[in-house]
């Protein structure tokens, strides 16, 4: 049987496609877990292929003409992993949380929409709830609208749903499961029991309130999933950055959490951010052709963006690094801190090592212009 999930993992681990260390580690984690006979979970290829096939039956209505969707390798890996891994001798799926970090224009909204459609009608759960969440209602509506576009673009799919635009609710006529858009600014603060919760652009969330609210509401729901889909950001005090660091520890093998799926596409810390080939590590969709060759036209367009960012600095450079390169940076409006350079200054010395040593303090008294 075809196994598109594992095929992509092998493509990456065998070095046949440019990738960053985090993506390599995610794929190797999949292969290592499959090879471990004592691992409490197994990978169900049939289940993975079923859900990948569902995604490829969706229709993209945006553009001049509607066209049947064809998933790329990394999308197969994500979908197949989330639905394929399950506990041995059980139908309970392995992953109850997911963290996916992709650069902008790499199919985040598609992925969220595909997952909503799958869970609402094809996952076998009756009278469930699927939530599309974000910091603001307007942003949550964007994910919801992606599902609505899939439905309106396909007459066969449209027969399975009732769409209410006025309150952003979609109801599956097969399972009576609803898909709703909810912002962090919603008036209700609890009672969110769902089978799937999409936490969109998690980097923009000032607290983990919404994420925890969704996760806690699923505690008694079998095969539920809370899925954060985001780009990198510039607030290192945000819960998303904390989750990102936690995920990196799991990928490196320093921490173990088998129920958390992780897929991060980013450049490595020592990569030159102005080298176009490095950008492909953070952009698994829009810089690649379907045959896994680099898309020279798209790279040329990104070069123009890079030139603008490099010359203008400030917000332009921040947006280029976080949104286009999917790279976390520290930015407070006045200066940009390179995290790789900052971490390179790390030391194993402690405060105890500083005792009885001279200390020098530099202060800049100048005030910024009013």
Which functions belong to the PLM regions below?
Residues 2-363:
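Phosphate/NTP-binding elements of NTP-utilizing enzymes
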Residues 368-370:
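Metal-dependent catalytic core segments for phosphate chemistry
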